[in-house]
């Protein structure tokens, strides 16, 4: 897994934040827009990287594809 791939996925979630009062993101829905097949290991590894590095966190109400953008994640997408 390349760090660049994970960061493309993170930046692709930016659209999902517009007009929402929450920081809920669903990377699975925007993976293809980032050039990542959401059914491949590369996607899973990218999400794991974003979780491990603190860019996203599991959504408080457990769900398979829902995550919450952290402050670190917001700073990254707003700076790039």
Predicted feature residues:
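Short alpha-helical segments that sit at the start of domains
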Residues: 1-21
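N-terminal positioning helix adjacent to the helix-turn-helix/winged-helix DNA-binding module
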Residues: 1-5, 42, 65
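Alpha-helix N-cap and coil->helix boundary residues
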Residues: 25, 42-45, 68
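A short, conserved structural fragment
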Residues: 51-61
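Minor-groove-contacting beta-hairpin "wing" of winged helix-turn-helix DNA-binding domains
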Residues: 63-69
